[in-house]
């Protein structure tokens, strides 16, 4: 997963 602008993991999603 990649880091999103939220600062979280994209897979966490």
Curated annotation (Swiss-Prot):
Give the species.
Scolopendra viridicornis nigra
**Tissue expression remark:** Expressed by the venom gland.
Molecular function GO terms recorded: toxin activity
Record-given protein name: Scolopendra 20385.85 Da toxin
Q: What else is known?
A: Shows similarity with the venom allergen 5 from wasps. This similarity may explain why patients with allergies to centipede venom also display allergic reaction to wasp, honey bee and/or yellow jacket venom.
> What is the protein's major site of localization?
secreted
Report the locations given in the UniProt record. Secreted
A single Gene Ontology CC annotation of this entry is: extracellular region
Q: Which family does it belong to?
A: Belongs to the CRISP family. Venom allergen 5-like subfamily.
Q: Recite the UniProt keywords alphabetically.
A: Disulfide bond, Neurotoxin, Secreted, Toxin
How is the polypeptide modified once translated?
Contains 3 disulfide bonds.
């Amino acid at each position: 997963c990649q880091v999103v602008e939220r600062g979280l993991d994209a897979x966490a999603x």
